[in-house]
Amino acid sequence: MTLTLPAPAKLNLFLHITGRRDDGYHQLQTVFALLDHGDTLRFSPADTLSLQCHQEGGASDLPTDDSNLILQAARALQAHTGSSKGAAITLTKRLPMGGGVGGGSSDAATALLGLNAFWALGLTLQELAHIGLTLGADVPVFVFGKSAWAEGVGEKINPIILPNDAFLVVHPGIHVSTARIFGDQQLTRDTPISKLPASLETVLTREFHNDCEAVATQHFPEIGKTLDWLKQHTGNARMTGTGACCFSRLTGLQQGQQLLQQLPQHWTGFVARSCNTSPLHQILGEALAKFRETKNSGKPA
């Protein structure tokens, strides 16, 4: 059986830093919106673990050793279960690295769910999320696969229902280090704790914001230019995560496609819709149902 699964992007519709723990981790509040656009992972039978990476539209400089979160996820799954099974994993990369759209975390989550199915391990989402949290604070939200209001260091996740909005996501061609942003002394770390609003439409209003945005634009003026360009063309703009990607909510997908044609040189972008259930869960469920049907019929998978 060969299994092909998506690793969807996310947006932080807002990001408040509400404190800092004694261990250095930041307390936060955020809303995660999952998108119907992202990377793709393919799992093929093999005796050992291996990873190949392909960058869509260009040559890949992504690591294929254990420094890659995909292989870290696979090794963690093996260690947790005692499994010694292998798989040939192929990553098709579309999401920018250091973009704030969760590319590495989403890849890791897809590796966990994909290999859990591929190796027939039978772990629950809670068990996979626990493993995922050791890889990164954003991994659990991709494991659970729901739009979410998140708190703590990002591990306290409450599923929510968001409008299925269209977004334009723009990457200004720079890489932002999360550690650099969170380590900046000017970063706001005392935003008052908010309550889940009655209307989730309000999370894109001024009451909510991204605390990392001011610091990121100081370090990387291109982010400020991106926000200004988006505001000029759509009337709204916000940075996701610690950057560098910025986004605007659109009136529809067609508006986004038109704006993509107008992007300044060296910028890239994509248009996507938010979805309350991850494409990963939808496609994995369909693949497993098809596999069971094929197995019961006696035909080769």
From Swiss-Prot:
Positions annotated as active site in the UniProt record: 10, 138
Alphabetical keyword list: ATP-binding, Isoprene biosynthesis, Kinase, Nucleotide-binding, Transferase
Keyword Zinc-finger in record: no
Leading EC class: transferase
InterPro entries linked to this entry: GHMP_kinase_C_dom, GHMP_kinase_C_sf, GHMP_kinase_N_dom, IspE, Ribosomal_Su5_D2-typ_SF, Ribsml_uS5_D2-typ_fold_subgr
GO molecular function, one term: 4-(cytidine 5'-diphospho)-2-C-methyl-D-erythritol kinase activity
Pfam families cross-referenced by the UniProt entry: GHMP_kinases_C, GHMP_kinases_N
Pathways per UniProt: Isoprenoid biosynthesis; isopentenyl diphosphate biosynthesis via DXP pathway; isopentenyl diphosphate from 1-deoxy-D-xylulose 5-phosphate: step 3/6
Reactions catalysed, as given in the entry: 4-CDP-2-C-methyl-D-erythritol + ATP = 4-CDP-2-C-methyl-D-erythritol 2-phosphate + ADP + H(+)
Example GO BP: terpenoid biosynthetic process
This enzyme's EC code(s): 2.7.1.148
Binding site for ATP: 96-106
Similarity annotation: Belongs to the GHMP kinase family. IspE subfamily.
HAMAP family registered for this protein in UniProt: IspE (MF_00061)
Function: Catalyzes the phosphorylation of the position 2 hydroxy group of 4-diphosphocytidyl-2C-methyl-D-erythritol.
Name of the protein described by the UniProt record: 4-diphosphocytidyl-2-C-methyl-D-erythritol kinase
Species of the source: Alcanivorax borkumensis (strain ATCC 700651 / DSM 11573 / NCIMB 13689 / SK2)
